[in-house]
Amino acid sequence: NTIEREYLVSNPDKIFVIRLKSKKPGALGFTVRFESLLLHTTTASNNFLQANGVAPVKAEPNYVEKKRNAIIFDKKRGTRFTANIQIKTNSGKITNTDSSLSLANATEATIYISMATSFNGYDKDPAKQGLNQTTIAQTQLTKALNLGWDEIKKRHVKDYQTYFNRVALKLEGDPSPNLPTNERLKRYAKGESDPYLETLYFQFGRYLLIS
């Protein structure tokens, strides 16, 4: 069986979305859980998983004082965060434990992940003057669920292309469009000219910078 996967992080809608599709009907299944090295708790019920946590109030190299913990957490201080996860599917069965969501016997599914923190600027205490990260994350998730995968992807691509399409580069020479990149790299390492590979690297660098 083949599973088709698409991932995107939308800047306009502040949402991380994963689209999964099984070539074989009813053969898609997975479990979603939240893991982090930060201090946090996780709950799950009714196809909704939420993690709430806090960043450390202090982190320093462990060689400063070997007897002291280099990373210090305090639930009443530091930047809070919330992560929400929900699965959307037209088939299969969704179940949950107290800290995970599972999908079985599905053909297609979309996983929506929204995250927010209480950070409210460099000059404000994120614990006492912070934003309501729980409300923000829930608002983002609700909006994304209403938009759906197709619309989110459309808005995401349009937003990205606003920057990417500003520049075009075309170098003279044989582009050899059917030659795979790994073969191009081998030839280039031997000193062969490949203007298409140079163009590809230029655009790849822009892709990473914009992202």
What are these language model-derived features?
Residues 1-211:
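Aromatic-residue-lined binding/catalytic grooves and analogous aromatic/hydrophobic interfacial grooves
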